[in-house]
Amino acid sequence: MPAPQPFLPLLFVFVLIHLTSETNLLPDPGSHPGMCPNELSPHLWVDAQSTCERECTGDQDCAASEKCCTNVCGLQSCVAARFPSGGPAVPETAASCEGFQCPQQGSDCDIWDGQPVCRCRDRCEKEPSFTCASDGLTYYNRCYMDAEACLRGLHLHVVPCKHILSWPPSSPGPPETTARPTPGAAPMPPALYNSPSPQAVHVGGTASLHCDVSGRPPPAVTWEKQSHQRENLIMRPDQMYGNVVVTSIGQLVLYNAQLEDAGLYTCTARNAAGLLRADFPLSVLQRATTQDRDPGIPALAECQADTQACVGPPTPHHVLWRFDPQRGSCMTFPALRCDGAARGFETYEACQQACVRGPGDVCALPAVQGPCQGWEPRWAYSPLLQQCHPFVYSGCEGNSNNFETRESCEDACPVPRTPPCRACRLKSKLALSLCRSDFAIVGRLTEVLEEPEAAGGIARVALDDVLKDDKMGLKFLGTKYLEVTLSGMDWACPCPNVTAVDGPLVIMGEVREGVAVLDANSYVRAASEKRVKKIVELLEKKACELLNRFQD
């Protein structure tokens, strides 16, 4: 029968086309399974989660669970692969993170559409445990440091915290001798340009909270919304979180506001010199206002938490403001309706007016620089670090957490007080200490790094003069700064106490394996003119040689 003969070539062509189309669906050699976010949906572009730093040219440059995708910088970055709900078949066996390793610091295994993937941690504990990291920044706690390391694709480790002592002095000098500081003169902790002010928007409206901060180096800004949960979500610049966007300049914009969006939004700004946290209260109001409060009825009862049992669940997606004794200010709580009434306030300002008596604690306010140009050195108290720190005040629109001297700041605010330490006793007087020491210098302390676990630390000294140097060649090398190792230090009451004097010091110590070392027997005193002159005279008269001959 001749009829079937033409059918065979057609069947062969159909099978060939089918096989070709099937092979096109297979991934290219070296490519990883899954899709890029914008391939799955045109609205899911790779955002700044990659920070445009993890560049790649193909999937082979990324981890097995990642794809090389176009990012907002016009380049390509490694990001977690996405899978459509009706896409590649998922193995019938349940996916598990068991045995799946996430080598990047701050990343955890998560199951994404049936596959284990590594995701950067985006929630951290609310309790502070300040951590100094190897990138020179201070983090709110260890979790924040790990999350930042994952975000930047780095490895960060904990280092001893630095104490910057070079500027400003504890008290300004006379006006005629004090130079006007500039914001870029020295490392400065973050400070706000303007004090945070409460905002209120109607349902469906847009709110903008701007954490406008100064500091040197420029501070990094993150946001979080305070909640009653153990962990808060960290919101970073150039990312979207539901109806919330954090811009590249640290501005939080909330679109289509809903009642549940009301609350305290906390800005955290940090740099190598310090850390700042400021609360921005946001109230969301219903357009159809409920019954107005009778102005003749005191609202103090509204400040207290509900003690009676309420029938039924809380009002869905509705929050009210009440006084929180732990914070000392107002915060949002789920609205509970008992007997048809809800206890609480619609706005943060109404709650503060009714429940907070007096001007409030000035020491709890963030440091505010202000927008003017009349720069002045000032001191502010940090309730997080529990210490006073310097900042530059512009001369206007600050707040009460603004002191002319460190002493006045410490007198007004709760700086931890420890019993006074006994004065460090010198094992030898000046002449004998000079002869027993390998070096004697005059210098100003610029930085101290404490290492309590090793009972030591490091002191960095700006050299004014080298009086004696038997082993390091400081004058020959023209050394301007000297790093001195502190050995056997009890940091509760350190001896010698290198931080006891603000001005120049006379420092004498040993040299061990080419390193300048101070221990409990080393000589450290204020560099008075009389003391320095005495050392020079002893060296000129070669008193140490005579002393050695006498001892021999």
UniProtKB/Swiss-Prot annotation:
Site note Reactive bond, residues: K126, E127
The residues covered by the WAP domain are: 29-82
Gene Ontology BP term (one) = muscle cell development
**Family to which this protein belongs:** Belongs to the WFIKKN family.
The alphabetized UniProt keywords are: Disulfide bond, Glycoprotein, Immunoglobulin domain, Metalloenzyme inhibitor, Metalloprotease inhibitor, Protease inhibitor, Repeat, Secreted, Serine protease inhibitor, Signal
- Cellular component GO terms held in the UniProt record: extracellular region
Where the record annotates domain BPTI/Kunitz inhibitor, the positions are 289-355, 363-413
Signal peptide residue numbers: 1-25
Q: List the disulfide bonds.
A: C36-C69, C52-C73, C56-C68, C62-C78, C120-C150, C124-C143, C132-C161, C211-C267, C303-C355, C310-C338, C330-C351, C363-C413, C372-C396, C388-C409, C421-C493, C424-C495, C435-C544
List, for all copies, the residue spans of the domain called Kazal-like. 112-163
Localisation per UniProt entry: Secreted
What is the protein name given in its UniProt record?
WAP, Kazal, immunoglobulin, Kunitz and NTR domain-containing protein 1
Sugar-bearing residue positions: N497
Q: Which SMART domains match?
A: IG, IGc2, KU, WAP
Q: What is known of its domains?
A: The second BPTI/Kunitz inhibitor domain is able to inhibit trypsin. It has however no activity toward chymotrypsin, elastase, plasmin, pancreatic kallikrein, lung tryptase, plasma kallikrein, thrombin, urokinase or tissue plasminogen activator.
